[in-house]
């Protein structure tokens, strides 16, 4: 909307239906591959993460792309006519917004993981020894008894000792819900002005 066209300049307001998916390039734990590695075998960007921008009728030359007042990059008239996938541009306002959402979701997942590890100890040790949900000194003694012989208890025992306290578990659940609420509040695309302007000096 709000389209404005001149000989060397094009501006309009753009509101996407969804945010771009920020591809994760990080390694977790002992993983040998990243999420980004899958792009070489799956056409994810073309089929599920395509935020296309295509402009035809431009004169030959280089054009600057500005989104939301931020300069994004330089493209030729031919590249713009062929179309660019803005989801690949990690410096756009919408990509930065998506990254914040991803970071909040990772924070939420880390808190959820702690709860899962607590429940793992409860169901794989405390349930078998008749101490399910006891979370008392007798349960602590049970952990100490079996921990030296179980690598998973060695990994998760300290966390269980912390999360055996109901208040800490409740805080963790509330923090997860707060993050979920914030994610849903902030994951909506906003209108952005896009400007494509021809470079006169290179």
Residue ranges and their predicted role:
Residues 1-202:
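Conserved catalytic region of serine esterases and O-acyltransferases that act on ester linkages
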């Amino acid at each position: 909307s709000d389209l404005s066209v001149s000989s060397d300049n094009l501006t309009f307001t753009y509101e996407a239906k969804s945010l771009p998916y920020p591809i994760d390039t990080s390694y977790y734990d002992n993983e040998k591959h990243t999420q980004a590695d899958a792009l070489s075998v799956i056409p994810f960007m073309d089929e599920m993460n395509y935020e296309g921008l295509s402009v035809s009728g431009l004169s030959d030359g280089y054009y600057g792309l500005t989104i939301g007042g931020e300069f994004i990059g330089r493209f030729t008239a031919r590249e713009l006519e062929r179309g660019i996938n803005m989801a690949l541009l990690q410096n756009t306002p919408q990509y930065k917004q998506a990254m914040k959402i991803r970071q909040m979701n990772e924070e939420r997942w880390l808190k959820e993981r702690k709860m899962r590890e607590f429940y793992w100890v409860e169901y794989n040790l405390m349930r078998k020894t008749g101490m399910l949900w006891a979370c008392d000194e007798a349960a602590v003694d049970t952990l100490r008894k079996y921990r030296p012989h179980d690598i998973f208890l060695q990994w998760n025992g300290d966390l269980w000792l912390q999360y055996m306290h109901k208040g800490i578990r409740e805080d963790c659940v509330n923090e997860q819900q707060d993050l979920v609420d914030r994610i849903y509040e902030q994951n909506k695309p906003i209108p952005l002005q896009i400007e494509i302007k021809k470079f006169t000096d290179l």
